[in-house]
């Protein structure tokens, strides 16, 4: 690996005359500027459990069976900006830095995703984004512009800068390469960071990004309102979502050429919802009335408002089994991720209710963009491209939280902005759809799609001790290893093989593997052999 003279000189300057930095609070503190305070530093022998510090309501799950490492937590006060971050510094360092992301409005250090990164021997960092909260709670943002800016981008950038300084000082060596991996809000954080600070990361893996947050959040309330109030004749009860999903499966599964419980081309399916209409012959608990079919029509339609303004794309066919998140669980309200944004990010106040929603909410969100969080500076990605950065973006086709079409739209906006300037998108940005995957991870048991490729949150969604892709630790099956090959060896991924294990334990038998294709290519089965083997598929 090449280390430039300039980088070596920078390290020499940083470490000259200073005593070696060790894993204790005072020693680590000596490597920091005064804005940063080391809260604790604790060396963990191999196979340890890291006990999550009290008060971390966002990420309470303790990772287990860790590699030997120094665990550090840091608090930062930088003018009006306040945030913290956690850092694992492995004994057996791979010379590289990884930052991981957060989810929803979560305020807390994501130690569980950090642990998955530690399994590759990265020095790995997560920021708390500047506040304490669960992922669906936005109250902290009320009339608090500084907390919003920290959440929007400041905490990620500042944490990255400081964690890199600490990493360099601890090892007395430069960082060879820096990576980022996050999903949902984590996907947004990665995109926003490289739009503002193209030098922060050499490679960014962004899953199901909440990039268009100032439209996504209002849409969350809008789409929820289609199915409310729950006493209305047009309300579709949660119990009917699997019924709708089964009918979509019946009509759309074969549209990709193979009937295999995986819908991989939902837009090629000419779905006829009238097959669900209640008639005297129907099973009354497995059909929809005309007003309910009207609601279904709304759910499958883009949100377009005044003057034909496109606000947000619709949920895709095949996402029905995750609809309980946005379309009514047991409450009579849209999801908090929409309502809290309007109440506390747009400062309409706690009295605001979803019945008050109108296009003015979208206009205000457009004008204010709370926290400067929306990752829509497509043009800025040319700076990331120019300095050699690589971006890998993916989205599950069965996502019921962030409409899959918002990622397709992101791809087209980046294309429309950069292609006219002569930028070859494939040279630095590649997008992959994941048939049958829900939001960031998982697949319904009636679908059983290959969904695991070591994307952000995936290891943590099945276990407290998994890292990477067990049994398939290579760049063909592991998106982070694929990114490393792209950045370090110039080997760009054309497909990623996703894996589905029996029972999702990552230890049972492999049930299915299948390549995910680089957009706009689609999966095509060869027509010969076992559809559950990746080798019988290609991307065309
Ligand atoms: C790791 O710790 C667990 C208990 O937490 C123990 O059962 C196991 O034997 C240990 N493994 C190794 C390799 O030390
Ligand atoms: C978050 O919680 C921690 C632990 O309880 C506390 O020390 C810290 O002050 C809190 N931060 C904010 C911004 O409220
Ligand atoms: C501190 O704040 C300054 C001014 O806003 C900003 O430029 C800098 O990136 C911040 N640094 C960190 C480490 O947060
Ligand atoms: C009617 O539909 C419900 C819900 O899908 C199902 O549980 C039940 O078995 C069906 N009844 C008959 C008689 O098919
Ligand atoms: C819609 O278009 C009309 C005519 O161009 C314009 O006067 C009006 O302000 C627009 N409304 C909104 C909400 O943008
Ligand atoms: C409607 O919402 C109310 C309030 O949350 C709840 O108590 C009730 O069970 C819901 N009814 C249905 C049919 O879901
Ligand atoms: C918001 O981001 C833009 C770049 O996208 C930048 O020009 C502007 O200064 C930022 N505003 C704040 C308040 O951080
Ligand atoms: C999967 O789980 C089921 C029960 O949840 C169990 O009966 C079955 O043996 C498991 N399969 C494997 C391969 O472990």
Regions found by a protein language model. Name each.
Residues 308-515:
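C-terminal subdomain of alpha/beta-hydrolase-fold enzymes, centered on the catalytic histidine
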Residues 192-194, 199-304, 449-475:
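A catalytic-pocket lid/entrance helix-loop region that shapes and gates access to the active site
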Residues 1-22:
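Fungal secretory targeting signals
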Residues 15-96, 111-112, 258-263, 272-352, ...:
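Catalytic-loop region of hydrolases
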Residues 104-172, 218-219, 226, 350-365, ...:
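Cap/lid segment of the alpha/beta-hydrolase catalytic domain
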Residues 173-184:
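Alpha/beta-hydrolase fold nucleophile elbow
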Residues 182-192:
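Glycine-rich nucleophile elbow surrounding the catalytic serine of serine-hydrolase chemistry
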Residues 83-86, 109-114, 135-139, 190-196, ...:
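Short, solvent-exposed loop/turn and secondary-structure capping segments
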């Amino acid at each position: 690996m090449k280390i430039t003279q300039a980088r070596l000189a920078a390290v020499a300057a940083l470490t000259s005359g200073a005593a070696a930095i060790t894993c204790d609070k005072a020693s680590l503190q000596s490597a920091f500027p005064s804005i940063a305070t080391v809260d604790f530093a604790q060396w963990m022998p191999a196979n340890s459990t890291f006990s999550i510090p009290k008060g971390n309501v966002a990420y309470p799950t303790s990772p287990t069976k860790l590699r030997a490492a120094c665990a550090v937590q840091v608090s930062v006060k930088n003018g009006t900006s306040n945030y913290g971050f956690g850092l694992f510094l492995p004994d057996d360092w791979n010379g590289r830095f990884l930052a991981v992301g957060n989810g929803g409005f979560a305020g807390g250090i994501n130690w569980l995703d950090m642990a998955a990164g530690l399994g590759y021997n990265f020095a790995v960092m997560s920021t708390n984004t500047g506040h304490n909260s669960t992922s669906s709670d936005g109250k902290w943002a009320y009339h608090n512009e500084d907390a919003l800016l920290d959440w929007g981008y400041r905490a990620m950038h500042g944490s990255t800068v400081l964690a890199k300084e600490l990493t360099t000082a601890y090892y007395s060596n430069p960082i060879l390469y820096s990576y980022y991996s996050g999903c949902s809000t984590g996907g947004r954080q990665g995109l926003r960071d490289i739009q503002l600070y193209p030098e922060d990361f050499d490679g960014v893996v962004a899953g199901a990004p909440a990039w268009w947050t100032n439209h996504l959040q209002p849409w969350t309330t809008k789409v929820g309102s289609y199915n409310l109030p729950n006493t209305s004749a047009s309300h579709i009860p949660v119990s009917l979502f699997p019924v709708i999903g089964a009918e979509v499966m019946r009509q759309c599964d074969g549209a990709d050429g193979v009937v295999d419980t995986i819908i991989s081309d939902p837009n090629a399916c000419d779905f006829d919802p009238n097959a669900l209409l209640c008639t005297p012959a129907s099973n009354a608990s497995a059909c929809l009335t005309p007003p309910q079919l009207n609601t279904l029509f709304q759910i499958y339609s883009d949100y377009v408002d005044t003057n034909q303004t496109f606000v947000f794309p619709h949920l895709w066919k095949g996402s029905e089994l995750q609809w309980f998140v946005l379309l009514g669980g047991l409450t009579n309200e849209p999801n908090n991720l929409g309502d809290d944004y309007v109440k506390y990010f747009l400062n309409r106040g706690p009295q605001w209710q979803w019945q008050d929603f109108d296009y003015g909410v979208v206009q205000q969100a457009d004008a204010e963009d709370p926290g400067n969080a929306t990752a829509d500076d497509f043009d800025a990605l040319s700076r990331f491209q120019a300095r050699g950065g690589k971006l890998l973006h993916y989205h599950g086709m069965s996502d019921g939280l962030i409409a899959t079409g918002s990622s397709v739209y992101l791809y087209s906006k980046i294309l429309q902005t950069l292609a006219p300037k002569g930028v070859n998108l494939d040279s630095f940005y590649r997008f992959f759809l994941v048939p049958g995957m829900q939001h960031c991870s998982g697949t319904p048991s009636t679908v059983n799609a290959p969904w695991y490729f070591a994307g952000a949150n995936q290891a943590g969604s099945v276990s407290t001790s998994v890292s990477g892709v067990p049994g398939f630790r290579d760049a063909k099956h592991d998106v982070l290893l694929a990114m490393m090959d792209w950045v370090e060896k110039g080997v760009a991924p054309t497909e990623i093989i996703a894996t589905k294990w029996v029972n999702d334990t990552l230890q049972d038998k492999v049930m299915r593997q299948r390549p995910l294709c680089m957009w706009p290519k689609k999966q095509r089965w060869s027509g010969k052999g076992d559809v559950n083997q990746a080798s019988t598929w290609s991307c065309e």
